[in-house]
C-alpha cells in the first residue's frame, strides 16, 4: 500500500494511509488474527454479523418507506446552562424524576 508524501507533510500522509487501511479492513483483520479463533466461534461470530447486517438493512428500508422515524440529529451549541431541549418547564425540579 502506498501513499504520496507531498511537501514533506508526513502527518497528512499518515492520515491518508490510516484511511486507506481502514477502508481495506486491515485493522479489523489484524484484530481478528491477534489470537486463534475456534471454528465454532468463527461460525457464531459470522452468523451474528449477518443477523446484524440484515436488521440494519431492514431498519433502513422501513425508514426510507416512512414506517419508522428517522434517527434524531444531534443538537450542538447548547453550552453550560443553556436550554438542552427540555421544553418550557426547564429549570428547577424539571428533571426526569420530577422535583427532588
From Swiss-Prot:
Annotated PROSITE patterns: RIBOSOMAL_S21
Biased composition (Gly residues): 78-100
CC per GO annotation: ribonucleoprotein complex; ribosome
Protein name: Small ribosomal subunit protein bS21
The keyword Ribonucleoprotein appears for this protein: yes
Signal peptide: none
Region (Disordered): 61-100
GO molecular function, a single term: structural constituent of ribosome
Lineage: Bacteria, Pseudomonadati, Pseudomonadota, Alphaproteobacteria, Hyphomicrobiales
PANTHER family xref list: MITOCHONDRIAL 28S RIBOSOMAL PROTEIN S21, SMALL RIBOSOMAL SUBUNIT PROTEIN BS21M
InterPro entries: Ribosomal_bS21 (IPR001911), Ribosomal_bS21_CS (IPR018278), Ribosomal_bS21_sf (IPR038380)
Sequence similarity: Belongs to the bacterial ribosomal protein bS21 family.
Protein keywords: Ribonucleoprotein, Ribosomal protein
HAMAP family: Ribosomal_bS21 (MF_00358)
Superkingdom field: Bacteria
Record has Ribosomal protein as a keyword: yes
One of the GO biological process terms: translation
Amino acid at each position: 500500500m502506498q501513499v504520496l508524501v507531498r511537501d514533506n507533510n508526513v502527518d497528512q500522509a499518515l492520515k491518508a494511509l490510516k484511511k486507506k487501511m481502514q477502508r481495506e479492513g486491515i485493522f479489523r483483520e489484524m484484530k481478528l488474527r491477534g489470537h486463534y479463533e475456534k471454528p465454532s466461534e468463527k461460525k457464531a461470530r459470522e452468523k451474528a454479523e449477518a443477523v446484524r447486517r440484515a436488521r440494519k438493512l431492514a431498519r433502513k428500508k422501513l425508514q426510507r418507506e416512512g414506517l419508522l422515524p428517522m434517527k434524531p440529529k444531534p443538537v450542538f451549541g447548547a453550552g453550560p446552562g443553556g436550554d438542552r431541549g427540555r421544553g418550557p418547564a426547564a429549570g428547577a425540579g424539571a428533571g426526569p424524576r420530577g422535583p427532588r
